[in-house]
Amino acid sequence: WVRDIYRSARAHDPTRLIEDNSACRYDHVETDLNTWHFYLHGYETLRRHVREVVEKTFPGSDFNFIGGNRQNGAPLLNSECGMVWGVDGSAGDSDLAWQYHYMLNEFRLQEKLCGFVFTELHDVVNEFNGYYRIDNTDKDFGYQAFCRGMTLRDLHAPDMVAMDCPPCRTVRAGETAETPLVLSHL
């Protein structure tokens, strides 16, 4: 049924991208966009998940597809991601701004990843994980404390310097620390 609908839509308008299933269950059949969803918190959990998806994405892979169907080289896109503040499985006291920063940093490290869709622009009742407060005022993400002048816009810029390291670590006096940097272009 999904394949028939995909092909019918393709026949009606061959100029548009068509997604067969918005893949929250890793259940693509035939699609122009290889997408997936996730709502995770914690640097290591998020990093492992994103890297697993990227590593398993290549033409011929059956990852993210069902029924014997395989990837055909369609662009990889995270079509739904967000934070878990105020919803079941809440991250509790985790910091929205820093989780968002390391989520986007991890996305920007992945050359195969063509983009993402963040699901909540504004806070809503019982979910406080948007870019803006429920009254539409700006949130202070605090990035200027990390790097003078940095704002949320810097994470969305076409070019960004991403860091391939945990969001924080302890370095003792006299120790040397290296941080691999990657120039990301979206």
Annotate each language-model stretch with its function.
Residues 1-33, 73:
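Active-site neighborhood of glycoside hydrolase catalytic domains
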Residues 21, 37, 119:
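Conserved residues at the C-terminal ends of beta-strands
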Residues 23, 39, 81:
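Histidine- and/or cysteine-centered catalytic micro-motif in compact active-site loops
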Residues 28-31, 42-186:
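Substrate-binding clefts and catalytic carboxylate motifs of secreted carbohydrate-active enzymes
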